[in-house]
């Protein structure tokens, strides 16, 4: 009999993401299953990320992905046909070899990742296992705390806020279903609070479903969030905590950080973070310093790391080499895991395990340009990461992930555990 797990076809196509830009979708077929995956793309990208291949030229304003699609159909597909779909690590290694560059710029990380994820889904479907169980085994049962980005600034918004994301974290909930209800209720109250204060035009939503009101000072969104949490009937800090993504590389100029029109040195910016974390119930800060300011990350981790999670996104770009450097230096204490920053599922999972071994937290994350693909929801549970960052509870591209987590929790009824206040150290 033919091998039911043999890859018989790999087909790529160009589809649209949540911003209306093209992205890559891939189907991987075996005689008994099919796996489909579509890849996201980011607006604020780290310099060291794997390269997303775009066509240039007039079509789609240069953002077409026909070259990446062709690389899958003409170069990758012939090599994969005949391989066993369950050999994820071998397939990912082959994809890396076929590309032959450090940053996947030859075939494109968007082409490679779409194939890598579709292979995993086809294997899970062939084995009749949910994806989280196929990737994580019987120990995958922790539902993550959502870091829900409800107020946008920086490159995600058209306002004057320098920090990019202001998030709420329902750490006091007892289940994921309850957590997402708290987030949704707070989000709707927030909409009302913002509209009352800034007018109804201030509640248009950004790429990730958050609001982008005309705010300038970093304390404004924090004050509004506290008000919304309280008006929704929850206790700030105890039930719903706050998190920030400063995305500092975006406001770093000539050796200085410029926040709300004011210049800060590294030391002064650290003082600002200390002030904010002592005034507001902030439990996590992402990219507090520039992606090459390792010293800044070491300082803030030393000073605030016990109380606050310090997350490296642009700092690490999900890259094991940069993560290793951070661990050795004591820079940050958590990794933001974006599969498209590194380009294969195996490398992303390896980075997560490296972080866990060092006692670092892991936050599985979306990108600002998303699709209806909900793979990261399964990945968060597979890794028992305890945290997921996938936008506000609005826009179907964001809710696709939340809805998948609701389904997973239902499927794991009786064994599912919501990470809650243990989001940083799920098992320790």
Curated annotation (Swiss-Prot):
The entry's keywords: Cytoplasm, Glycolysis, Lyase, Magnesium, Metal-binding, Secreted
Enzyme type, top EC level: lyase
Enzyme Commission number(s) from the entry: 4.2.1.11
Active site: 208 (proton donor), 338 (proton acceptor)
Binding site for Mg(2+): 245, 286, 313
Reactions catalysed, as given in the entry: (2R)-2-phosphoglycerate = phosphoenolpyruvate + H2O
A Pfam family this chain is assigned to: Enolase_C
Top-rank taxon, per record: Archaea
Note accompanying the cofactor annotation: Binds a second Mg(2+) ion via substrate during catalysis.
Keyword Transcription on entry: no
Any one Gene Ontology molecular-function term assigned to this protein's record: magnesium ion binding
Entry GO terms, CC: cell surface; extracellular region; phosphopyruvate hydratase complex
Location(s), subcellular: Cytoplasm; Secreted; Cell surface
Key word Metal-binding present: yes
Protein family membership: Belongs to the enolase family.
NCBIfam families membership: eno
Functional description taken from the UniProt entry: Catalyzes the reversible conversion of 2-phosphoglycerate (2-PG) into phosphoenolpyruvate (PEP). It is essential for the degradation of carbohydrates via glycolysis.
Protein name as annotated: Enolase
Native organism: Pyrococcus abyssi (strain GE5 / Orsay)
Recorded name of the encoding gene: eno
């Amino acid at each position: 009999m033919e091998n039911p797990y043999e890859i018989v076809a790999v087909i790529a196509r160009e589809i649209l993401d949540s911003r209306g830009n093209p992205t890559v979708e891939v189907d991987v077929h075996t005689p008994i299953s099919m796996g489909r995956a579509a890849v996201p793309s980011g607006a604020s990208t780290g310099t060291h990320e794997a390269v997303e291949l775009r066509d240039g030229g007039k079509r789609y304003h240069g953002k077409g992905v026909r070259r990446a699609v062709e690389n899958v159909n003409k170069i990758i597909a012939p090599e994969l046909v005949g391989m066993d779909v369950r050999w994820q690590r071998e397939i990912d290694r082959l994809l890396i070899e076929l590309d032959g560059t450090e940053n996947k710029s030859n075939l494109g990380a968007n082409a490679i990742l779409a194939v890598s994820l579709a292979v995993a889904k086809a294997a899970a479907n062939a084995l009749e296992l949910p994806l989280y169980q196929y990737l994580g085994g019987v120990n995958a049962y922790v539902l993550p705390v959502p870091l829900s980005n409800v107020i946008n600034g920086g490159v995600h918004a058209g306002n004057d806020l320098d920090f990019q994301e202001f998030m709420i974290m329902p750490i006091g909930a007892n289940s994921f279903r309850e957590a997402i209800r708290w987030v949704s209720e707070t989000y709707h109250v927030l909409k009302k609070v913002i509209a009352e204060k800034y007018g109804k035009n201030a509640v248009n939503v950004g790429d990730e479903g958050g609001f982008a009101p005309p705010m300038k000072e970093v304390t404004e969104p924090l004050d509004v969030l506290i008000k919304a949490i309280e008006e929704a009937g929850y206790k700030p800090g105890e039930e719903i905590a706050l998190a920030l993504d400063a995305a500092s590389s975006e406001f770093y100029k000539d050796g200085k950080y410029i926040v709300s029109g004011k210049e800060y040195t590294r030391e002064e910016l650290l003082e600002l973070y200390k002030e904010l974390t002592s005034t507001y119930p902030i439990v996590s800060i992402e990219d507090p310093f520039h992606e090459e300011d390792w010293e800044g990350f070491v300082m803030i981790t030393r000073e605030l790391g016990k109380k606050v999670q310090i997350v490296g996104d642009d700092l690490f770009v999900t890259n094991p080499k940069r993560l290793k450097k951070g661990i050795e230096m004591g820079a940050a204490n958590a990794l933001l895991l974006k599969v498209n920053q590194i380009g294969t599922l195996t490398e992303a999972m390896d980075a997560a395990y490296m972080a866990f071994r060092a006692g670092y937290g892991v936050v599985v994350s979306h990108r600002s340009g998303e699709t209806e693909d909900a793979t990261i929801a399964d990945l968060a549970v597979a890794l028992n990461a305890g945290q997921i960052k996938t936008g506000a509870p609005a826009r179907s591209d964001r809710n696709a992930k939340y809805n998948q987590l609701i389904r997973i929790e239902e499927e794991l009824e009786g064994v599912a555990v919501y990470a809650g206040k243990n989001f940083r150290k799920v098992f320790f």
